[in-house]
Amino acid sequence: MAIIMAESSYERRVKALYEKQIRMEALEGKFIKKVYKFNSNLLDVKEAVLRHQRKVGKLQKVVMERREELEKRVSFMEELAQELEATKLRNLAMKDQIKQRKMLARQRKNEIMERIHTLSKTTGTYVNHEALPARVKGVTVLRGDKRDQLIPFDLNATDAEGLDSLCQHLESLNVDVSQWQQLVSLAMDVAMEARAPITPPKEAANCKSIIEIDLTSPTSHQA
């Protein structure tokens, strides 16, 4: 009887150990599944992190490129503003210079015209300014007690022989030829200046106009 009870107790222990082993194997299986799932999820997370890092890297590269482009544009605009200001100052200086030259030219012309008027009265000579500078045309009036003598002249400006002959004739009539020649010379200068094309100062050739400044951004040709 004692032997039977001992065997029954042994079987229960063996059965309990077997059931415990079954439970442990089941728990181990569940644990392995959880570990596998965790590792799988961890791998997915790592891949997602890598994808995110790649995106962040690309975004950082774009941000860096945009920042460099913005810095270049800011630098370009600063240079452009400086160039515009320098051009504005050059243009103002040139306008003042041209204004000053025009004023001096008017003053000189007035002085010449006054001198011409004086010489015209002194020599009694009236020059046809419309004929100049191609021709020397006019009339010299010799005042007389009874009547005045008119000496008209109409010569090609390049006719040196004719002009010399005219001067000799006037000199024979007691006309101050040096003043007469000075009168014709001044009238010729006025006529040539009036017909000469207006040329800007030499500085104007080196002065860049505002509209000629390259307004293309240095970053506009980036790939």
From Swiss-Prot:
Sorted UniProt keywords: Cell cycle, Cell division, Centromere, Chromosome, Coiled coil, Kinetochore, Meiosis, Mitosis, Nucleus
GO cellular component: Ndc80 complex; nucleus
The keyword Zinc is annotated on this UniProt entry: no
Any Gene Ontology biological process: cell division
Main location: nucleus
Compartmental location: Nucleus; Chromosome, Centromere, Kinetochore
Lineage top rank: taxon: Eukaryota
Ranges in coiled-coil conformation: 51-116
Signal sequence coordinates: none
Subunit structure: Component of the Ndc80 complex, which is composed of Ndc80, Nuf2 and Spc25.
Family note: Belongs to the SPC25 family.
Function in brief: Acts as a component of the essential kinetochore-associated Ndc80 complex, which is required for chromosome segregation and spindle checkpoint activity during meiosis and mitosis. Required for kinetochore integrity and the organization of stable microtubule binding sites in the outer plate of the kinetochore. Participates in SAC signaling that responds specifically to disruptions in spindle microtubule dynamics. The NDC80 complex synergistically enhances the affinity of the SKA1 complex for microtubules and may allow the NDC80 complex to track depolymerizing microtubules.
Protein name per Swiss-Prot or TrEMBL: Kinetochore protein Spc25
Source species: Drosophila yakuba (Fruit fly)
